[in-house]
Amino acid sequence: MRQALPLVTRQGDRIAIVSGLRTPFARQATAFHGIPAVDLGKMVVGELLARSEIPADAIEQLVFGQVVQMPEAPNIAREIVLGTGMNVHTDAYSVSRACATSFQAVANVAESLMAGTIRAGIAGGADSSSVLPIGVSKALARVLVDGNKARTTRQRLTLFSRLRLRDLLPVPPAVAEYSTGLRMGDTAEQMAKTYGITREQQDALAHRSHQRAAQAWAEGKLAEEVMTTYVPPYKNPFAEDNNIRGASTLADYAKLRPAFDRKHGSVTAANSTPLTDGAAAVIMMTESRAKELGLRPLGYLRSYAFTAIDVWQDMLLGPAWSTPLALERAGLTMADLTLFDMHEAFAAQTLANLQLLGSERFAREVLGRAQATGEVDDAKFNVLGGSIAYGHPFAATGARMITQTLHELRRRGGGFGLVTACAAGGLGAAMVLEAE
């Protein structure tokens, strides 16, 4: 094992995560229909600051992410600063790392804290799958640009006369990987076939996720970390995730048809995470700054790792690559963990990564490591359910996982937790957290 890389400032301060909050997550076109991601981000950051009672000028940086970009608000981070009453001089910039976007935001704030350029910052992300940037065809886009430069009405009419009816149709956002043309679900199907993951195994994991999430809500475990929201026309509050199917049975999952490989597939809408709207954020500080403000941190960031693999085959294996690296940098092994939380993009992807984490052959032949990362104990794995149940607003999921894991560690008396996610482009992310 290589030497651990401690995440501390020059003064030896640990990186503290003081608090975290999210909106309830809503299925596409339901509770947050028509609410853009920037407004969801303002909601969660505004409420997070109000609850924390931290002086507004104490926050020196905000790093926020958005995967489904909105052309009218390209820097969502700065818009949140301007729309929440934060100090207008607060540094703010936006990041995007697909489904690991808020992992990246947290890492960036941590690096600013370690560099000593700030003492407190906010990291997070928001996405809306209900407010989408609907584009135009390439032919129409070219004519619009050329028409803007045309000098006469006749020239403009000539340009538009070249268009066909199909050129006028709206173009929805791409759902496939740009470099391969493969959808995420196609990759999940690849992984199910490569690693021999059955439909029954996938449905069982999805059912487990929903049951555990429903239980977490019923026991009040999420109440402190999920805000109540009010959206136009402001008649009814929205306080709980609306994707969780607590009353479902395994027989219900078996009824659905494959969504991607219609003939031979096993990936369905029920064993995949749905399109979702929501936002999440965390407040981060140096340990000494938290003490100055009289705050007890939720926990600390012990290590993080980002990895990348090829996109043509089984590209959602990021957790199998990033987990051993994050553990190594933390100076820990799988056995040292109290909790292990993995983003469930698809049940097939989740099960494939779990399989490879325990594989000696994968460790030796692919990772070049002497031994497997380690089997994940089911008693430590996604103990409150995962993304299949809660939903997945792309840029918000990492911050949700971090906050949720730290709260659960505190309930268990402290310890170490690892959160990890796959992401489009063959990317992976993992972070080791510590609570006392």
Swiss-Prot record:
Q: Please, one GO biological process term?
A: fatty acid beta-oxidation
Kindly state which reaction or reactions the protein catalyses. an acyl-CoA + acetyl-CoA = a 3-oxoacyl-CoA + CoA
- Coiled-coil intervals: none
**What does the UniProt keyword field contain?**
Acyltransferase, Cytoplasm, Fatty acid metabolism, Lipid degradation, Lipid metabolism, Transferase
Q: Which pathway does the database say it acts in?
A: Lipid metabolism; fatty acid beta-oxidation
| Pfam families, per the entry | Thiolase_C (PF02803), Thiolase_N (PF00108)
Q: InterPro entries in the record, alphabetically?
A: Ac-CoA_C-AcTrfase_FadI (IPR012806), Thiolase (IPR002155), Thiolase-like (IPR016039), Thiolase_acyl_enz_int_AS (IPR020615), Thiolase_AS (IPR020610), Thiolase_C (IPR020617), Thiolase_CS (IPR020613), Thiolase_N (IPR020616)
Q: Name one GO cellular component term.
A: cytosol
In which broad location class does this protein mainly occur, judging by the first location in its UniProt entry?
A: cytoplasm
Q: Report the active site residues.
A: C99, H392, C422
PANTHER family of this UniProt entry? ACETYL-COA ACETYLTRANSFERASE, CYTOSOLIC (PTHR18919:SF107), ACETYL-COA C-ACYLTRANSFERASE (PTHR18919)
**Could you tell me what this protein does?**
Catalyzes the final step of fatty acid oxidation in which acetyl-CoA is released and the CoA ester of a fatty acid two carbons shorter is formed.
Q: How does it assemble?
A: Heterotetramer of two alpha chains (FadJ) and two beta chains (FadI).
Name the chain's protein.
Answer: 3-ketoacyl-CoA thiolase
What is the gene called?
fadI
